[in-house]
């Protein structure tokens, strides 16, 4: 998952607008605050629950390595976790390295090569609020686009945010049908979308002169 603004948003000072029922983490050193997207606590509990196969989470941010580790630590402290719920924590360093070797931004192939057999094109997807990270060829059948969690944006409605409810529903479908998903077929191939009955998330977008078919909660 991306951090800003997918699961959390960083603010140098406390947000003066509506934050009722939002989990937050305040940095005692500089007074900055991380606000967590509605439903994140419940999704964490779901992901680490008694689910077979297990749901593995990861962080991938455009921030630097220090920031990504800070967010990981903040999540552990805020939600009283004895150990990190994240299988990996990536930052802009991994993005730059991938671009140098001809990969795309937030390229899921990095994850699959780092954890061979554990993460595959049949069981892995990137959740991102930046459509360009899902439109490209490496992620278009292994990505899920969501609305930005942006408290500063007047168009964002805190009370209508169902992103984590959608993700939980999607993950349940994947887990339920995982035995029927071929190892050599991308998770969100058209056949898999039909098999898992998740067509309501299947969207068509025009990107330049191309029509892109991707999964999205928007």
Where are these regions (language model features)?
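C-terminal cap/substrate-recognition subdomain and adjoining C-terminal extension
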Residues: 66-218
């Amino acid at each position: 998952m991306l951090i800003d603004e997918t699961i959390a948003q960083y603010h140098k000072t406390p947000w003066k607008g509506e934050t009722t029922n939002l989990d937050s983490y305040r940095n005692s050193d500089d007074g900055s605050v991380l606000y967590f997207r509605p439903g994140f606590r419940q999704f964490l509990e779901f992901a680490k629950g008694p689910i077979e196969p297990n749901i593995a989470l990861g962080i991938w941010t455009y921030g630097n390595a220090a920031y990504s580790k800070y967010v990981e630590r903040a999540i552990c402290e805020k939600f009283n976790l004895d150990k990190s719920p994240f299988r990996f924590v990536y930052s802009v360093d991994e993005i730059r390295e991938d671009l140098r070797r001809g990969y795309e931004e937030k390229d899921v192939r990095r994850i699959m090569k780092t954890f061979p057999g554990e993460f595959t094109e049949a069981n892995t997807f990137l959740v991102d609020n930046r459509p360009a990270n899902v439109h490209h060829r490496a992620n278009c059948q292994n990505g899920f686009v969501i609305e930005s969690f942006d408290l500063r944006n007047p168009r964002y409605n805190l009370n209508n945010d169902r992103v984590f409810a959608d993700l939980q529903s999607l993950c349940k479908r994947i887990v339920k049908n995982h035995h029927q998903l071929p190892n050599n077929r991308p998770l969100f191939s058209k056949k898999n979308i039909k098999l898992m009955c998740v067509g309501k998330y299947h969207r068509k977008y025009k990107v330049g002169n191309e029509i892109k078919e991707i999964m999205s909660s928007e």
